[in-house]
């Protein structure tokens, strides 16, 4: 089935739209959560398949997303991080839902807005990278205050930077001479440390900074732990990720109901815990060539689906 409809491509092009709608197993009178509202593309599609009793609750911590709020009585916008999903749904009187969707990572708007500092091309921008401008931690503060070991772990885990240790050590040394303030200044200062393709290298470094600043993996874990209590039996959760670490977290949680694959231990030996989900996608769904031609940024997207038992 083709669910593609108009959204706000100037803000964000929804990725794997048809696949996400199919994965949610939409029910006309159902209650659904869009954890990453953004440009409203996914929420708009969900609403198109609901009747007057259906509801969509859209979360987004980025204040810029408010401009895209849908004028529909069946839609409620919640301007907060999805890590607080249960708390804010309960404030709206919602204790159980039929489906949850999350399109992780940075939006096209955030990436393309030069003042936000997400892109390596925004060289005049300050080192900000906050998805939620209400928080205090920025990329600038990370680079200028984190210790060498913490920086190394960040670049290695979140960016898979090959020379993470060397980079971290250099940053601590160089910032004592001149603190990092802008994208251009940071790139110029570490230019001699680049390994391989410069564009790819800086993209990996900036990805690591962004994930750290916004605690993206922490937020994902917190949200996932609340899902079993929120989803109705037979309800679906659909997660679209763009980073291997995020995908591993989602895969593990869908399969085991926790973030470690090891069996729990009791005094008499090990025993497997009972997962609250049935995994629908044994392998992740990836974009078609047609979608990639239309939206090259979707290339690393992976979609996984699980159903509440």
Predicted regions and their residues:
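S-adenosyl-L-methionine-dependent methyltransferase catalytic core, i.e., the SAM/SAH-binding region
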Residues: 1-309
């Amino acid at each position: 089935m083709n669910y593609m409809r108009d959204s706000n491509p100037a803000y964000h092009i929804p990725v794997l739209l048809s696949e996400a709608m199919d994965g949610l197993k939409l029910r006309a009178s159902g209650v659904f959560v869009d954890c990453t509202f953004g440009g409203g593309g996914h929420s708009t599609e969900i609403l198109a398949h609901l009747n007057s009793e259906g509801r969509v609750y859209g979360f987004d911590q980025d204040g810029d997303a408010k401009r895209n709020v849908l004028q529909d009585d069946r839609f409620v916008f919640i301007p907060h991080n999805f890590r607080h999903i249960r708390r804010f749904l309960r404030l709206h009187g919602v204790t159980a839902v039929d489906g949850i969707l999350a399109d992780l990572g940075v939006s096209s708007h955030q990436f393309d807005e030069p003042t936000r500092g997400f892109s390596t091309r925004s060289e005049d921008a300050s080192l900000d990278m906050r998805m939620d401008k209400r928080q205090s931690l920025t990329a600038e503060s990370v680079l200028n205050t984190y210790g060498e070991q913490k920086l190394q772990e960040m670049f290695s885990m979140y960016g898979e930077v090959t020379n993470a240790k060397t980079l971290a050590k250099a940053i601590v040394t160089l910032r004592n001479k001149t603190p990092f303030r802008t994208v251009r200044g940071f790139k110029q200062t570490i230019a001699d440390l680049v390994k391989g393709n410069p564009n790819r290298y800086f993209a990996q470094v900036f990805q690591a900074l962004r994930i750290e600043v916004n605690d993206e993996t922490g937020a994902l874990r917190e949200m996932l732990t609340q899902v079993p209590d929120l989803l109705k039996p037979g309800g679906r959760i659909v997660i679209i990720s763009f980073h291997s670490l995020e995908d591993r977290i989602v895969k593990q949680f869908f399969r085991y109901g926790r973030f470690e694959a090891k069996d729990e231990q009791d005094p008499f030996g090990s025993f497997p815990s009972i997962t609250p989900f049935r995994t629908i996608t044994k392998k992740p769904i990836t974009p078609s060539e047609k979608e990639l031609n239309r939206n090259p940024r979707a290339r690393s997207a992976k979609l996984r689906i699980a159903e509440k038992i």
